[in-house]
Amino acid sequence: MPRKKPFSVKQKKKQLQDKRERKRGLQDGLRSSSNSRSGSRERREEQTDTSDGESVTHHIRRLNQQPSQGLGPRGYDPNRYRLHFERDSREEVERRKRAAREQVLQPVSAEVLELDIREVYQPGSVLDFPRRPPWSYEMSKEQLMSQEERSFQDYLGKIHGAYSSEKLSYFEHNLETWRQLWRVLEMSDIVLLITDIRHPVVNFPPALYEYVTGELGLALVLVLNKVDLAPPALVVAWKHYFHQHYPQLHVVLFTSFPRDPRTPQDPSSVLKKSRRRGRGWTRALGPEQLLRACEAITVGKVDLSSWREKIARDVAGATWGNGSGEEEEEEDGPAVLVEQQTDSAMEPTGPTRERYKDGVVTIGCVGFPNVGKSSLINGLVGRKVVSVSRTPGHTRYFQTYFLTPSVKLCDCPGLIFPSLLPRQLQVLAGIYPIAQIQEPYTAVGYLASRIPVQALLHLRHPEAEDPSAEHPWCAWDICEAWAEKRGYKTAKAARNDVYRAANSLLRLAVDGRLSLCFHPPGYSEQKGTWESHPETTELVVLQGRVGPAGDEEEEEEEELSSSCEEEGEEDRDADEEGEGDEETPTSAPGSSLAGRNPYALLGEDEC
């Protein structure tokens, strides 16, 4: 080992002076947002992020940065699959902040909540997804990687050339993550596209449907996940909408956290966390439907009897566990073989491969971040085998899980496809990490104009002297009122911390506690028809049969009521720290507005 060289005090002083000079130079021009928390985050990112030298990726924001001292012992880079989105300019961020302070919120009509997929993705336009370019076995790995890089840059150039940044939504700019999708599609016999029932057209890119069913010739199963967060009539309406527009789809309803929609919500426990214990994962709604869909696709080419037997065992075990009152450990179930795929698995396997090789059906699970892909796998297995998180981008690389000896599941990292969605809606859909949003106030305004946030949370206008008087609300007022109600204060000046309050409101929306559900076209006119539809009644009965049966316990902390609930996982977002130990507002007893909503009103006196 070489001898350490002495480092004098004079040298150390010079080193610190140089470091201060470098920081001072990097911070020039960023004074406009120097007093805000989001401004300091933006400065840190601009100091650390470097462009790749390509014009289309010049303003890319890299999220979920992990500390790294170079490659690990196995050559693994923890930042290889982090989310890459286009960066908002400082001028655009400041403009949205001013609008959040000045624009008075007006409630929108029910027709505004109707989303048509043709308006979101514009099928036939350049809003496609990158395809793996043609290749041959004569090409070296370096040649193939270089060709894929050039093809990906051309793909980005076409999109940014056809649409301005203001019209485009956030979408994935990381080629490494798209390569994961290519590999999963190549190795799959059946593709599951998981969507969130609250906004399924947001998570359903028609280009992927055309590619899977057309070019690849594979069966595509659409999973409408988290059906516990939407009214049963709306779930059935969305199911028929996709059947009508995409006849080759197999549609399956799923939730890992079923609840009986006929049971009134207890207003005093809506915002308390229900922690699943024992065999809670075995009560998932949907495994039987998915099995029937796979049987219809494979038509006897694969023996799926072991899967049916497993579902029967899970149901019997859950019933026995609930009846006996004994708590079962999740680890008591049979072992699940897990394969973590390395770079060697990313090598091309050839233009074609044998379908149902060795009598095993491979089911690929793809979808947007935060739609519950990992929770779906846990629900199918019957216990927790995949860690889940509210933070988008939690799944870093694809893994395979043998559900039975003849059924293999493949979990792909979440991918954001390009679209024309409002970016505020993407934030509310959980696509963008909330803790890293530069400006969360307009997303709060988007939410408050579609559901009565002020009334639901019993907020008092910050400028109101008379509580009974009507005052116009803007997004900033809502955040300030929530900060006052929750006691969110800044560290030094003890002012209302509106940034933390905005993040808190967005988390309530993403978790489903403030539930914003979008409708298919024409739903408002035909709502009565869907409510009396036979499939709606059947879904209500089915949810009631598999709903909670005493295997949950409430804790004095905030509840995660969506299907992407964290089980023993702490949210790694910085702004989440400390929120779980605070008092949660509850509704006053006998509140006349408490109904079967997934969220309930919070009482004035009990906050």
Swiss-Prot record:
Possible regulatory or functional link with the histocompatibility cluster. The modification Phosphoserine is found at S32, S33, S34, S51, S68, S324, S561, S562, S563. One of its GO terms (molecular function) is GTPase activity. Residues 178-418 form the CP-type G domain. This is Guanine nucleotide-binding protein-like 1. In contrast to other GTP-binding proteins, this family is characterized by a circular permutation of the GTPase motifs described by a G4-G1-G3 pattern. InterPro entries: G_CP_dom, GNL1-like, GTP-bd, P-loop_NTPase. The keyword Nucleotide-binding applies. It comes from Pan troglodytes. Residues 1-14 have a biased composition (Basic residues). The lineage of its organism: Eukaryota, Metazoa, Chordata, Craniata, Vertebrata. Pfam families: MMR_HSR1. Residues 15-26 have a biased composition (Basic and acidic residues). GTP binds at residues 225-228, 367-374, 411-415. Keywords: GTP-binding, Nucleotide-binding, Phosphoprotein. Belongs to the TRAFAC class YlqF/YawG GTPase family.
